[in-house]
Amino acid sequence: MTKLSVNINKVATLRNARGGNMPDVERFAVDCELFGAQGITVHPRPDERHIRKEDVYQLKAMVTTELNVEGNPTDEFLALVTDIRPTQVTLVPDDPSQLTSNHGWDTRRHLDFLKGVVNQLHAYRIRVSIFVDPDPVMVEYALRAGADRVELYTGPYAEMFAENPKKAIEAYRPAATKAHELGLGMNAGHDLNLKNLKPFIQAFPWTAEVSIGHAIICDALYLGIQETIQEYLNLLK
């Protein structure tokens, strides 16, 4: 079964908007696990506009499922993740000024750089996933870089799905199939929600993990976080 990793960045954004520690990010992560989530995802950025470095350390001590830390592999980021050693690091080529991640790596162009980063993380026994666009060439070069997994950027899928679900699925089939054929683990994330998640998993049942944050928090405003997580888990069965 595909695992659900809950991205809690939005919870940290809410906390930081008011100061103090409400909501408690670490408590929220633990509760997500209690409600069935099989992982917690965070994406600390240099300006700490949501997740802070201290959060990552606390989460490492408290999370009992899988901790996935996303980020651009700067020296500062690599120092953080090699210190805490999360279950998985997802390499994302985002600029510090970006509101959210909006493209994957050009793994062919940056092959040598990514190889070096992957080797560094593997030395600490950290599973490495590389965030890529749905392009089979990018998937192949992620494998050449030594990645354990790729995470397919599903922003375009979500956008297409609203207009033409079949077209959205077919646009991702070459990349998803390539990952499966190569024996490369495949994650997916960005703009997945209660409407578009199940068709994606039905089309690509070898998806190892989905990372979902924004939609889960939006749904939780109406359903509550416990029921929301159950709704997503039901779609992944």
Predicted regions and their residues:
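Conserved N-terminal beta1-alpha1 strand-loop-helix module at the mouth
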Residues: M1-E70, D75-E76, L80-P86, K167
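Short beta-strand/loop segments at the ligand-binding rim of alpha/beta enzyme cores
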Residues: M1-L4, A61-V69, V117-I130, A179-A188
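Glycine-rich phosphate-binding active-site loops on the catalytic face of alpha/beta enzymes
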Residues: H43, L91-Q98, R149-F161, W206-I225
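C-terminal helical cap(s) of enzyme catalytic domains, especially alpha/beta-barrels
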Residues: K60, H103, N164-P165, D219-K237
